[in-house]
Amino acid sequence: MPHSRQPSISSSIMSQSNHNHPQKIGPWKLGKTLGRGATGRVLLATHQTTGQKAAVKVVSKSELQDEETEKNGDGLPYGIEREIIIMKLLTHPNVLRLYDVWETSKALYLVLEYVEGGELFDLLVERGPLPEVEAIKYFRQIILGTAYCHALGICHRDLKPENLLLDSQLNVKLADFGMAALESNGKLLETSCGSPHYAAPEIVSGLKYHGAASDVWSCGVILFALLTGRLPFDDENIRNLLLKVQAGNFEMPVDEVSREARDLIARMLEVDPMRRISTEKILRHPLLTKYPMSNEDLISEKSLPHPQTGYKSLGSVRNIDKQILSNLTILWNDRPEEEIVDCLLKDGSNPEKTFYALLMRYKHNQEDNTNNNSPKKSTSFNNKVVRSGSKYSLNGTPRRKRASHISVSRPTSFQYKSNPGAGATANRNSVARHSVASSANNSPRKSPYKSPYRSPYRSPYKSPSKRYSYNQSPTKSPYGRRSNSQRQFENEPLKAKPRNIYNEIVDAQSNFSLPPSLPPSLPSKDSRYMIDEPNQPQLQQPALSQVPENPIVDESPDLMQSAKISSGKRNSIIGKNNNNSNSNKRMSKRKSIRASMTTGLKRNSITMKLLSTYAKLSGDDDWEYMDKQTKRTSATFAALCDKIFNQEDYDEEDEQLVDPEEKEAKEYERLMELERKKHEAELKARRELEKKKRRQKRRSILSSKKLSIIVKNDADPNNSEQELVDEGIKQPKRQSKNLTALRALSEGNHASEELTLEDVENLKRRSASQPVPKRRQTPVLTRRPVSRLDPLWQAHENEQLDRAKDALEQEWRDSQKRSSTVSRKKVNRESMISVMDDIVEEDQGRVNRRSTRNTYYERERDYELPEPTVEDSNLTDDYMTEIRKSRLLNSQLNVRDPLNEKRKSEPKTLISNVQIPSVTRKSRNFTTSNKRLSVLSMYSTKESYRDLNSIINSPDENPEQHQNMNKPALRTSIADRLDKAGLAEPEYETETDGEDKVSVIDLDDHLADRRTSYYDGSGKRASRASTTKRYNVHSSSGQRPKSKVPDLPKNDYDDTFVSNSDEVHKRQYKSMVSDESSASDDVFDKIKLPDGKSTKSSIDELANGTSTSGHRKPKIRHSQPGPEMLIPHLNGGIESSQPMSKVRGNNSSGHDDSVPPPPPAHKVNKKPLDDKTNFPPPEVDPKRKGSFFRKLSWGSKKTIENNTNAATNTTTQQQLPSPAESKEEKPKSSFFRWFSSSNTPSAAEIRKFNTILPKHEMSTALFALLNSWSNFGLKDLRNDQVGYYITGAISKHNSFNLKSCKFRIKINQRDFNQKSEIVCVRVKGSKVTTDTLFSEIEKVLLKEGVLDK
C-alpha cells in the first residue's frame, strides 16, 4: 500500500475564513492572532493552569477532507496522524516542538512551542549582514535541525528566514513543517513548493527531486543572506527570478565574505543536486569548524541519528522489535504485518522505516532515562492506558470519544550517531530528559520542551504543567516510580494472554473508568471519584461480562499492564491528599502482584498496552464531532498515542468531563434559571416601583394641598414627578434596601425604570428639537407650566415655538440639500463648485442641526478659522500652489465655517458680479508693486511661449528647438481636456520664477486640433500641429512645471457658469468673470512689459511670471480691456517669448515684423492699431484678469503666428495686424475650437451679439468657453467648423439646479469677415436656462471686450 504521501496537515492549504474558534482548546485558552500564513491563522494560547504560552495553528479540515476523497489508500485520518506523530517524535533543540493537536468539526488546532524571539528574517532586516561568527552560530543550528530531520527521512522543503524562529536565547527553531514530506521508498518528490527565492533549481524546473538536497540549497541561500544581508537570486519579475534560480546565476560576494564561506556557498548552491553537499558534510566544513561550538550545539550534533537511520534496511526479521512492529501495525490501521516488515527490510527511505527509527529512538531514550532514575513507587503503565480515547467503555457501553489531544511526545534520543544511549541528556533540554524515567518524559505535559502537542485523543483538560514540573521533579515521572520488577519483563518475547487475565484487566480498567456517579458516556479514566469511593470498582465488575470477546486478546502481550491502575500516582501528581494516595497505592500493589504472576507481561514495554482492546475498536470510525469540544481523531491513533507516549496525569477538571449533550443540557438549565430569576426580579422591581409611585403620588397630593398654589388635576403628575426625584434620595431604609437588592437581581432594569416619568416629560419637551441643557436645580425648569396662569407659561410657550421653528427650518434645509446635492453629485463629480457646495452645505446642515447648542462655538470658530485673505497679497509660486491646493482640497475646514456665515449674510448674486481677488505672484520679472493677473487667470491662461520667434521661423522644421522653449503652464481644466484629447497629461514642475512653463493652450490646441481636424485646412492643421508638437516635445523634456494643485476651477470660464445657488463658489473663488473693485481695475496698468512688444500673450507670460525681460507699466489697459487684449493675445502666443520692445499702442502699419501687436497700448507714446479693435473699449471690463478670452485671443495668436511664418522669418518687432487683417490665418488653432459641439437648434428665442472677432476665431473661442463649462452641466457640445454653428445642451443634473435645455449658436460674419455676429437660439427645454446661459455668454464677451458696441 502506498503510504508515501498521505494527506498532510501541513501540506494542505488551509483557509480558515471564519473566526469562530472555541475560546479554549482543551486546557489552552486561545488569545490574539499572532499571524497568518498559507496554512491558516496562528493564535496565541495560554495554558489555563500553568500560564504557559503556546502558538496554536488553526488548520481547516475542508481541504483535508477533499484530499481524503482523492486518496482511497489509508484514508484521511491516518496520513494526518502519521505526520502529527512524526512532528511529535521530532525532539530536537532546533526543531519547533509540537505540543498538542486538537480538533473540532471544522478545524485542527496544532499547539506549537511559542518562541518570543521572532523570525530570523526580522533580525536580518533590522541588522543587515551579520558578522561571520554570529552568522555561523545561527547557520550551524539551522543545519543541525535540518540534518536531524534528514536522517529520519523528513524533508522540510520550505526553509527560509521567515520559517526560522528564535527563542529568548536566540537559538534557532525550524518551524512550519507545512511543506514537509516523507521521502517514500526512495521515490523522488514531485511537488513544486516552497518560496521562489529559496527554492532549488530542480523544484523550480518541476523535476523530481530529493527533498534533502533541496533543503541544502535553501540553507545555502540563507547562509548567503546571513553574511551579505541580501539574497543571491532576486528580481522584481517572478519569471526572471525563477530563470536565475534555474540557471544558478548569482554574483558571489568576493569582498564581503571569507574564502571558506564562498566555498561553502558555492557547494551548497550547486545546480546539480547530485553534486550538492550534504548536511553531514556541511557540519564538517572548515567554515563551521573555524569557530568554536557551544556545548548545546556539540551535544546536539553528537546525538544526531545516523544519517542512514531512515534509509538503511534493518537486515533481517530478527532485528525488528516486535513491540514497535505492533505499534506500526496499529498506526497503519491494522495493515498486514508482513507488508510493514517488507518495508522495513527494504533499502531506501519510507514512512515505515522513519516511524520505526523514531519509535526505536524513543524506546532507547526511555530505557536510558529509566536506568538513570532510581525506581520509585510502583506505578502501572496501564493506569494511563485506560484513558484512551476509545469510543466505547470497556464494559461495553458505547461512549462518545471525549475531546482530547494527541499527547504524543518526542523521543529524546535515537540510536545516536556516535554513542547510543549517551545522548539521553544531550540536547539543550536535556534537563528534562534525564529527569524522566519513562516515555512520560515525552508526554506533552512532561515534555522537557513543554511541547503543547498532545494527542488528539487526550483529554482536553490535561495540564501541561507537568511539562514544567517534570523538568525539575523526576519523581513525578510515572516511569521514575516504576519498580525494577516491572522492567524485568521488558525484553521477553511476546506471549499470548489467557482470557481470564484479559477479563481481570478489563475489570480493573472499567472499575476506574466509569464511576457510577458519572454518566456512562464519560471518558474512561481513573478519577478522583475513585479516591473518595474506594469501593466503587466492585460495583462495576458485573458489567465486564458484557464485554464482547476479542479474538486478539489471546495474542496481545501486554494486557496485564492495565490491571495495575494506580490513581495514587496520578493523584499525588495532581496534588491529592496523602491518605487517598496511600489507599490507591495499596490497590496498585495488589494489582502489581496479580500482574507479576502473569508470565510474559512487560511493564515498561514500549509497545502499546492493551493492544487488543484498541484493535477491537480500530475498525469503528463513526465517531462524532463536537463543535464546542475537541476530540481525538480515531481510535487506532488514540491507541498508538496512549501506548507509546504514556498518558499524563489528569487534573481535577479532567475527571469532570461530561457528555456534550449533558453539558449542553446543564448549560441550558443554568441559563433558564438565570432568566427565571431575572424575570422574577423584574416583576418584583415593577411591583415595588408601582408601590413607590403610589406613595409618591399621595405625598405629592398632600404637599400640593398644603401649598395650595396649583390645580389638583394638573398638579398630580408634575408634583409626583418632582416628588419622585426627591424620594429617590429620601427613601426609607427598608425600601432602599429592597430596591438595591431588586436592582441587582434585575440587572439594572429597575434603575432605568425609576427615571421613566422624568424621561417622558423631557422627551415631550424635546420632541421638536435637539435637547437643551437641563437645569434640574431650579424648579422653574424641571416642570412644565401648569396652566396659563402659571408664570412659566409664556417662557415655556416661547421655547416650544422656537424649537418647532428650528426643527421646521432644519427639515426644510435637509430636504433642499438632498434635492440639490444628490443630483449635482450624480453628474458633476469633477466640478469643484458642486463639491465645495456639498461640503459647505453638509457642514451648514450639521451646524443648523446643532444650532441650539453650538451657536456660540460657531461664532468662536469664525474667529479661530477666518477665511484666508488673498486680495492684494504678494505670493510666491509655491505659496500660490499650496493655497490653491489647501483651499480646495486639503484644508476645507479652514474655509467651511467662515463660508457658512458669509453664505447666510451675503446676497445671492450671479457669478458675473463676484469680485475676483487680485493676487500677485512673485518672479524675477515682477517687483513687489507689480500686480499679477487674477488668481484664476493663472488657471485660464492658455499659452505663452518664451521664444516664439524661433517657433514662427521654423514651426515644423526644427522640432528640437521646441524643447528649449520654456513655456509657462497654468492649470485649467487641463486634466479633463487631456482625457478628451487622448493626450498624455504633461509633467508639471512648480518654479518660482515661473519661466519654464508650458501654457495650457498647447493642450487646448491639441484638443481643438482633434475636434476640428476634419474641417480644418492643411494650413490650420499645420499651425496646430506645430503647437502640439511644441507642447509634446516640451513636456517630454520635463520643462513643463507640474502643478501641485488639484484640478481647480480650472480657468476663468470654468467659473463663469455659476448660478445663484452656487454661493460657495462666489464666496470662495470669486469668479474671474465677476466685476472687480476699482483697485484691481488697473491691473494691467501696473504690469511692466518687455521692451520688445506687449501682446496679450506677453501679458500672459507676465501673468505666469515667465517673461524674460522687464516690463513697463501700461497706462491705457483699463480703458478698453477687451479688444486690445484679445487681438494682441491672439498674436501674443507668437511674441511673448521675444524681447518685447514695442508696446501695444503702435500702429500696425508701423511694424513689419513677424511679431503680432502687443496688448493694449501700455505706453501712451505708442498708437494703437488703426482697427477699431485697437481702441480702448469702454470700461466694460475693468479687470482684464481671468479673461477667458485669453484663450480666445490665442486663436488670433495662432493665425498670426502662421502669418508671420509665411511672411517673414525676421525677428524684428512688428505690430500685429488687426483681427481683420489676420482673419484668414486664424482658423488654425482658434481658441474657441475648444468649445465646439453641436445640437439641433429650433427657433424659440433669438439673442444676437456683435463681436469684433472674425467668424472662425469667434467660433473657436466660443466653443472653448462652452466646453470649459462642461463640468458644470453643459453636454453634447458640437462645433461645426464648416457651418460655424455650435450646438449643445444643459443637463438636468447641472451644478446650478437649472432645468435642462438645448441650444444652438450660429456665428455669422460681418464687415468682410473682420467681425462676426453671434446668434443664440433655444432649441428646446427651459427658456430660463437658455436665457441664463446666453446672458453668461454675453457677460463673458463683454468682460473680454470683444463685443462690438
Curated annotation (Swiss-Prot):
Keywords: Apoptosis, ATP-binding, Coiled coil, Cytoplasm, Kinase, Nucleotide-binding, Phosphoprotein, Serine/threonine-protein kinase, Transferase. Residues 406-418, 426-442, 471-488, 1024-1040, 1134-1149 have a biased composition (Polar residues). ATP binds at residues 34-42, 57. One of its GO terms (cellular component) is cytoplasm. The modification Phosphoserine is found at residues 10-12, 15, 294, 300, 303, 388, 390, 393, 407, 409, 413, 455, 469, 473, 477, 485, 556, 634, 720, 746, 891, 973, 999, 1059, 1074, 1077-1078, 1080, 1094, 1097-1098, 1154, 1218. Hyperphosphorylated during mitosis at dozens of sites. Among these, 7 have perfect or minimal CDK consensus sites and are CDC28 targets. It catalyses: L-seryl-[protein] + ATP = O-phospho-L-seryl-[protein] + ADP + H(+); L-threonyl-[protein] + ATP = O-phospho-L-threonyl-[protein] + ADP + H(+). Disruption phenotype: Leads to hyperinvasive cells. Residues 661-701 form a coiled coil. Residues 1-20, 369-384, 443-470, 570-585, 1202-1215 have a biased composition (Low complexity). It is found in: Cytoplasm; Bud neck. CDD domains: Kcc4p_like_C (cd12194), STKc_BRSK1_2 (cd14081). Residues 28-288 form the Protein kinase domain. It is an enzyme of class 2 (transferase). Residues 1-30, 366-498, 510-532, 570-593, 712-737, 756-798, 1011-1229 are annotated as: Disordered. The active site is at 158 (proton acceptor). Its EC number is 2.7.11.1. GO terms for molecular function: ATP binding; phospholipid binding; protein kinase activity; protein serine kinase activity; protein serine/threonine kinase activity. Gene3D superfamilies: Fungal kinase associated-1 domain, Transferase(Phosphotransferase) domain 1. The modification Phosphothreonine is found at residues 69, 191, 397, 412, 778, 869, 876, 941, 990, 992, 1056, 1095, 1106. Residues 1044-1053, 1083-1094 have a biased composition (Basic and acidic residues). One of its GO terms (biological process) is regulation of cell growth. Associates with the septin complex which consists of CDC3, CDC10, CDC11, CDC12, and SEP7. Serine/threonine-protein kinase which regulates the localization and the function of the septins during mitosis. Involved in the formation of the septin ring but not the basal septin band. Phosphorylates septins CDC11 and SEP7. Required for the transition from pseudohyphae to hyphae. Acts upstream of IRS4 and INP51 in regulating cell wall integrity responses. Involved in propolis-induced cell death. Belongs to the protein kinase superfamily. CAMK Ser/Thr protein kinase family. NIM1 subfamily. This is Serine/threonine-protein kinase GIN4. It comes from Candida albicans (strain SC5314 / ATCC MYA-2876). The gene is GIN4.
